[in-house]
Amino acid sequence: NFMRRLRSYTQELKPDFALIGEVLFGDYNIIVNDEMLHSCTNYECYKGLYSSFNCMNMFEIAHSLHRQFGSDQWCIYRGKHLMTFVDNHDVTRLASILTNKKHIPLAYGLLMGMPGIPCLYYGSEWAEPGEKAPDNDYALRPCFEEPKPNELTEFIKKLIRVRQGSDALCNGAYKNVVIQNHQLVFERCSEKERV
């Protein structure tokens, strides 16, 4: 009952306050609903993102995206905006987990095009490496003296601007169009536009 009380309390203080939780597995609907959290981390799609590029099997992420956000009645998170990410404070950074570093911009392109609320982990916008260790996460949480912007940073900025200007990318339905091992084409469609 704590989450329900927290949601009610925060909405009284600030109606547009968003509650986002970290949920590693299970049915996100149990905690992401009109009475509890507004959103939570989407670990299923996180795993599908890097794994699809490492195995060159776009069927994996396409399956997860359709299962979660497709238009079929059985799709489980239609209309929800889960927090999507390519890395965070608990997992090996994208620059360290991808076997082909040329796929880093592609992974960000997919992140910004898929349903959800894209979240960037500090330092990853310039491809900072960092591997999760069995006994600590220090490599995932470095202290930077200053930012290290590069071409990837500029590319991600462009993707963010495109997403911000697109109702379909922010709120639209999801539909797989073409799925091959090395290619994934999907459609995002809202009442205002189709991408």
Residue ranges of each PLM-predicted region?
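Intrinsic-disorder/low-complexity regions
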Residues: 41, 86-87, 175, 180
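Active-site-proximal helices and loops of the catalytic beta/alpha 8
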Residues: 1-76, 110, 129-158, 188-189
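Carbohydrate-binding surface patches
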Residues: 177-195
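Beta-sheet entry/capping signal
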Residues: 9, 16-18, 81-83, 117-120, ...
